[in-house]
A protein has these predicted regions:
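Intrinsically disordered, low-complexity regulatory segments enriched in Ser/Thr/Pro
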Residues: 47-84
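Short, compact, well-ordered microdomains
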Residues: 85-92
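Generic detector of bulky aromatic hydrophobic side chains
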Residues: 59, 94-96
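Negatively charged, low-complexity tracts enriched in Asp/Glu with abundant Ser/Thr
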Residues: 1-45, 70-74, 81, 96-104
């Protein structure tokens, strides 16, 4: 653990880009005033958005509903696990539970 790199993120993208409508980007809007600038993979399906990125040598996979009031996240342990989680998300086979986001 803690040996995931941005190259691993691009490896996940390379495995899935021809199968699913996913994108790689270098920034994410947090709200009306802030953005985060780092490579991340983004996917939209069945009213939810998925983000996969590398943070501190670990994969982080976030899923949020369309209203941005419910979500969850987890840490795939490797490229294979991340690719499998995203494929399941895109095919509607995910079984994770969404939790309320705290009010800001």
């Amino acid at each position: 653990m803690f040996d995931i790199t941005v190259d691993d993120l691009y490896a996940v993208y390379g495995r899935l880009k021809d199968r699913y409508p996913i994108i790689m980007t270098n920034s994410m809007a947090e709200d009306e005033h802030f953005t985060e600038d780092f490579p991340l993979l983004v996917a939209h399906h069945h009213g939810q958005t998925l983000w996969l990125y590398e943070y501190g040598g670990d994969f982080v996979l976030d899923v949020m509903d369309e209203a941005e009031t419910m979500g969850t996240h987890w840490h795939p342990i490797d490229v294979d696990g991340a690719a499998m989680d995203i494929a399941e998300f895109m095919e509607g086979r995910s079984d994770y539970e969404l939790f309320p986001f705290p009010e800001q």
